[in-house]
């Protein structure tokens, strides 16, 4: 039996978000729908989820002592990481002391860096992956590239949103690629992964829920990447029944091996009927924002339902849908959005994240659309996103 308290009362059920961006904001809203008390934590003030939380704290989440202090102050029943850059060793300690880390501290630690999850997938679970090597010096990096061959991709083992990644076609790029990877790592300079390039027809995110009533799958989400970050996503991505079966089997093995209850974003390459594992996030995925309009339960609602120990039952997908990001480039601490009236309509919505500032290129919102076909849904979402005029 799941018992939920009432927020701001002595018996409240308390959820602490570690990372309070746009994904955390939607998780906070879903917690609020169930009367759960929300504490939002991030490294900067006025982060999106802080706008809809009961309380908030600004700390360096890579500082284990600072993390422990805020946990001891707030005494959450659930700790919900939204990002990779967290003191995961402290999360493991806190879990050993009885705290509930979502989905579990081991999953958070393994997926914090690409080495942990790649070794789990390829070496322990024997799943198909790209060829790969790890390196922690420029000389070893060059040896890894020579072994993998051209073209290849180098990524910091700890980074997100494409930071520090380079597609390498020739030896002339190696010095710059190494330096860029060192700058792009989330926790500072260090180790990289060199991956062989996989030939694929398309990439998908298979949003997979591990819950008290078993493992559930959303319809596959297709997406387009640019500069290492997603620009549009859509659902459902068409694929053969055999490829879908293989994708679900890979995702099932990965989430069960990681453990715990919650939603996982499993990234896969698909080539015909073949499926290759890429990465996994033990939390809602940015490409999954399309589920805000495409499903009866969004990825955020599913995550909350799962980690609270509630059954999922089933997931209803409404039909062709898409998301397109609102990604302006400017510098401002007083952002405004004009022409919004032309970005909404029947089966057409937007989400503006409420980020407090922008310095360069930053994702500030997303347009959501449904249509008779995926192609039309993508075009509707892209057009709507383009209608929003960001000023500052």
Curated annotation (Swiss-Prot):
Binding site for ATP: 114, 155, 160-165, 195-198, 203
Entry annotated with the keyword Transferase: no
EC number, as in UniProt: 6.3.1.21
Domain ATP-grasp as annotated: residue spans: 119-308
EC category: ligase
GO BP annotation list: 'de novo' IMP biosynthetic process
Catalysed reaction equations from the record: N(1)-(5-phospho-beta-D-ribosyl)glycinamide + formate + ATP = N(2)-formyl-N(1)-(5-phospho-beta-D-ribosyl)glycinamide + ADP + phosphate + H(+)
Binding site residues for N(1)-(5-phospho-beta-D-ribosyl)glycinamide: 22-23, 82, 286, 355, 362-363
One cellular component (GO) term of this entry: cytosol
SUPFAM superfamilies associated with the record: Glutathione synthetase ATP-binding domain-like (SSF56059), PreATP-grasp domain (SSF52440), Rudiment single hybrid motif (SSF51246)
GO molecular function: ATP binding; magnesium ion binding; phosphoribosylglycinamide formyltransferase 2 activity; phosphoribosylglycinamide formyltransferase activity
InterPro entries: ATP-grasp (IPR011761), ATP-grasp_carboxylate-amine (IPR003135), ATP_grasp_subdomain_1 (IPR013815), PreATP-grasp_dom_sf (IPR016185), PurT (IPR005862), PurT/PurK_preATP-grasp (IPR054350), PurT_C (IPR048740), Rudment_hybrid_motif (IPR011054)
Pathway(s): Purine metabolism; IMP biosynthesis via de novo pathway; N(2)-formyl-N(1)-(5-phospho-D-ribosyl)glycinamide from N(1)-(5-phospho-D-ribosyl)glycinamide (formate route): step 1/1
Residues annotated to bind Mg(2+): 267, 279
Known role: Involved in the de novo purine biosynthesis. Catalyzes the transfer of formate to 5-phospho-ribosyl-glycinamide (GAR), producing 5-phospho-ribosyl-N-formylglycinamide (FGAR). Formate is provided by PurU via hydrolysis of 10-formyl-tetrahydrofolate.
Subunit structure: Homodimer.
Record-linked HAMAP family: PurT
Similarity field: Belongs to the PurK/PurT family.
Protein name: Formate-dependent phosphoribosylglycinamide formyltransferase
Native source organism of the sequence: Escherichia coli O1:K1 / APEC
């Amino acid at each position: 039996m799941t018992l939920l308290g009432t927020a701001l009362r002595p018996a409240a059920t308390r959820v602490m978000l570690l990372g309070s961006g746009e994904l955390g904001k939607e998780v906070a809203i879903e917690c609020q729908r169930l009367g759960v008390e929300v504490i939002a934590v991030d490294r900067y003030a006025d982060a999106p989820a802080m706008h809809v939380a009961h309380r908030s704290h600004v700390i360096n989440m890579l500082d284990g002592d600072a993390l422990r202090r805020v946990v001891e102050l707030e005494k959450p029943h659930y700790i919900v990481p939204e990002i990779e850059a967290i003191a995961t060793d402290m999360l493991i300690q806190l879990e050993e002391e009885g705290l509930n880390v979502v989905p579990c501290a081991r999953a958070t630690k393994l997926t914090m860096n690409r080495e942990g999850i790649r070794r789990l997938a390829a070496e322990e679970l024997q799943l198909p992956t790209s060829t790969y090597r790890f390196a922690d010096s420029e000389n070893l990096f060059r040896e890894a590239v020579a072994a993998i061959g051209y073209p290849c991709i180098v990524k910091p083992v700890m980074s997100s949103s494409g930071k520090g990644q380079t597609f390498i076609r020739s030896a002339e790029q190696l010095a710059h690629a190494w330096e860029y990877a060192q700058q792009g790592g989330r926790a500072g300079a260090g180790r990289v992964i060199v991956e062989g390039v996989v030939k694929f027809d398309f990439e998908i995110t298979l949003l997979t829920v591990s819950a008290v009533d078993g493992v559930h799958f959303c319809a596959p989400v297709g997406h387009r990447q640019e500069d290492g970050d997603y620009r549009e996503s859509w659902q459902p991505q068409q694929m053969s029944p055999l490829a879908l079966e293989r994708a679900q089997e890979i995702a099932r093995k990965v989430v069960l091996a990681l453990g715990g209850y919650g939603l996982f974003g499993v990234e896969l390459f698909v080539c015909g009927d073949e499926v290759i594992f890429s990465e996994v996030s033990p939390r809602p995925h940015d490409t999954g924002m399309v589920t805000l309009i495409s499903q009866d339960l969004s990825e955020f609602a599913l995550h909350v339902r799962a980690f609270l120990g509630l059954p999922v039952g089933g997931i209803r997908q409404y039909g062709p849908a898409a998301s397109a990001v609102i990604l302006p480039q400017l510098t401002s601490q007083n952002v405004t959005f004009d022409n919004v009236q032309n970005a909404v309509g029947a089966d057409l919505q937007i989400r503006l994240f409420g980020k407090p500032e922008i310095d360069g290129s930053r994702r500030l919102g997303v347009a959501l659309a449904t249509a008779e076909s995926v192609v039309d849904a993508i075009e509707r979402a892209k057009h709507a996103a383009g209608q929003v005029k960001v000023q500052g």
